Swiss-Prot record:
This is NADH-quinone oxidoreductase subunit C/D. The gene is nuoC. It comes from Cereibacter sphaeroides (strain KD131 / KCTC 12085). Its main location: membrane. Pfam families: Complex1_30kDa (PF00329), Complex1_49kDa (PF00346). It comes from the Bacteria. Keywords: Cell inner membrane, Cell membrane, Membrane, Multifunctional enzyme, NAD, Quinone, Translocase, Transport, Ubiquinone. It is a peripheral membrane protein.
Length: 580
């Protein structure tokens, strides 16, 4: 797709304003244009696209880097040691734009343009050592870590290093590194001449919903400032993607968000299938949609129950876990697993639906609407719940976009942005469903939107049940992994492909591709770079929760600690999704 066809006004305006500094358009298979810019206009171009152009790009969806030192297939791209990529979204245009910058290890900061670029730039510094010309702290790795893990020169396995020995000296150094001085962070310790209480909220606290620490400055029960500290759950998922085959990385996707099941597999496979040119059969697409909506309900039931629990209602979570069990029994019967199914495949799904699947699904669909009605009476209509949530933790659409908020957190402000409707994938254009919206953007609306989304997911699942097409569940394509078993038993070429893919790995054509979906928490995006091998050269995992937590310091000042707990619950995150 050419840039002129995708966003002609933006292209013309950008070239008119910056001329030759807009260096080149990169030929890719992406659904959006990819432009290279000069460093001299990197910040100015982002400011122009966000603040000055008609129909602007208010959302910085992602900012990430690529170590180009070992890459062989870069025809037509400027020389670069580390390439910096920003991914911008225009809601008015319903269009994306990716900007690239060739660097020698130094890059201008755009944190003054897009507020949420701060954490992304800290991550790029942490993982690649990029210097943004400002003080940049590590964010995922501990401050004592040596090296930058996503550089190609950094080891990927513990066996590549000498055995680890925890000496007394090292233990003391690591212990000192856990101490955070508010003064060094520029955070006040006095208010009106009185000393603030500095409190570590987490990392081991039930209300942080994971291994997550927030450093708080308190005046009595009032939160004066908050400083989130993440990284405790970091496992190096993007580094692992470089050491696994394209097929072998699928189980790792489940663990990016361990409550999302197959939802985290889908954007990765959409990206790989785009690179391979694979068209997924209609039956496989509908199975994917049905399972994604099941896992959306499973996640939202957990959120619903724990949200009520965190404001003092203990009963709902027990009832909702019982209903989640009914859903997990169906998912277990179809995929063979409850939470980590690894069921999707390159080109389709692992196997066809089992006998009796339709009766199980129909029983769930008949059961759940009345249960959701009961939960609405227990939670959303409760005067106590409304008193704790209405008007608390509110933000508007502009603020949400400024900090990269997507999903229910964005739609709670009244912004109608759902990729299943606006950019249908995997056959979502076939389904009739509504996009629930809020008005105030407060805790109550965020809860209400997710409660209503479960009803819409039930509608989608029922349409899958009633309209499931016949046909294969894997594409008839040489790069489908693994190939359909029936073809392997008849066709020697398919058997050879299976042998090569299983023993060596799928050889994916060189190029770049992105898979985007409307995940249960928001925009989930995988950007993959292939160098024509059996493994990914670079896999970028954009999760919604990483952006959502960055917003906490702007929302919670002035709240009580009890309201802080409610606000954290309303974000709906898991730390594996944040830290990867």
């Amino acid at each position: 797709m050419s840039l002129d066809q995708a966003i002609p006004e933006a292209l013309q305006a950008l070239r008119t304003r910056f001329g030759a500094a807009v260096r080149a358009e990169q030929a890719t298979g992406e659904a959006f244009p990819v432009l290279w810019l000069d460093a001299s206009v990197w910040e100015a171009a982002h400011r122009f696209l966000r603040e000055e152009i008609a129909a602007p790009f208010p959302l910085l969806a992602d900012l990430w880097a690529i170590d180009e030192s070992l890459r062989q297939h870069r025809t037509g791209q400027p020389a670069s040691r580390i390439t910096l990529c920003s991914h911008l979204v225009s809601l008015v245009r319903n269009a994306d734009l990716r900007l690239k910058l060739a660097t020698d290890g130094r890059a201008p900061s755009i944190a003054g343009v897009y507020a949420n670029a701060d954490w992304y730039e800290r991550e790029a510094h942490d993982m690649f050592g990029l210097d943004f010309g400002r003080e940049t702290r590590r964010i995922l790795m501990p401050p004592t870590w040596e090296g930058h893990p996503l550089l190609k020169t950094h080891y990927a396995r513990a066996t590549e290093k000498p055995p680890f020995v925890l000496t007394d000296r090292l233990f003391e150094a690591e212990e000192r590194a856990t101490i955070t001085d508010p003064d060094l962070l520029g955070l006040p310790t006095l208010r009106d001449g009185e000393e603030l209480m500095v409190l570590n909220f987490g990392p081991h606290h039930p209300s942080t919903h994971g291994v997550f620490r927030i450093l708080l400055g308190l005046d009595g029960e009032e939160v004066v400032w908050a400083w989130p500290d993440i990284g405790y759950h970091h496992r190096g998922a993007e580094k692992m993607a470089e050491r696994q085959t394209w097929h072998g990385f699928i189980p790792y996707c489940d663990r990016i968000d361990y409550l999302g099941g197959v939802i985290s597999e889908l954007p990765y496979l959409l990206a790989v299938e785009r690179l391979c040119g694979i068209a997924v059969p209609p039956r496989a697409q509908m199975i994917r949609v049905m399972l994604c909506e099941f896992y959306r309900i499973m996640n939202h039931l957990l959120f619903y129950g724990t949200m009520a629990q965190d404001v003092g209602a203990m009963s709902p979570v027990f009832y909702m876990f019982t209903d989640r069990e009914k859903g997990h029994e169906i998912l277990n019967a179809i995929t063979g697993a409850r939470m980590h199914p690894a069921f999707f495949r390159i080109g389709g799904v692992a196997m066809d639906l089992p006998n009796g699947w339709d009766a199980m699904v129909r029983g769930f669909l008949d059961w759940m609407p009345a249960r959701l009605d009961e939960y609405e009476r227990m939670v959303l209509r409760s005067e106590l719940f409304r008193a704790r949530t209405v008007g608390v933790g509110a933000y508007d659409t502009d603020m949400a976009l400024t900090w990269g908020t997507t999903g229910p957190g964005l739609r709670a402000t009244g912004c109608d942005w759902d990729l299943r409707k606006l950019r249908p994938y995997s056959g979502y254009e076939q389904f009739e469903f509504e996009v629930p919206l809020g008005q105030r953007g407060d805790i109550f609306d965020r809860t209400r939107v997710r409660a209503d989304e479960m009803r819409e997911s039930l509608k989608i699942i029922r349409q899958c049940l009633e309209n499931m097409p016949e046909g294969p569940v894997k594409a008839d394509h040489p790069l489908t992994t693994p190939p359909p078993r029936g073809a392997m038993q008849k066709d020697i070429e398919t058997l050879i492909a299976h042998f090569l893919q299983s023993s060596w790995g799928t050889v994916v054509p060189a190029g770049e591709a992105t898979g985007q979906i409307e995940g249960h928490r928001g925009l989930t995006q995988y950007s993959v770079v292939s160098d024509g091998g059996t493994q990914s050269y670079r896999t970028r995992i954009r999760t919604p929760s990483f952006a959502h937590l960055q917003m906490i310091p702007k929302i919670v000042p002035g709240m009580t600690v009890a309201d802080l707990v409610a606000h954290i619950a309303s974000i709906d995150f898991v730390m594996s999704d944040v830290d990867r």
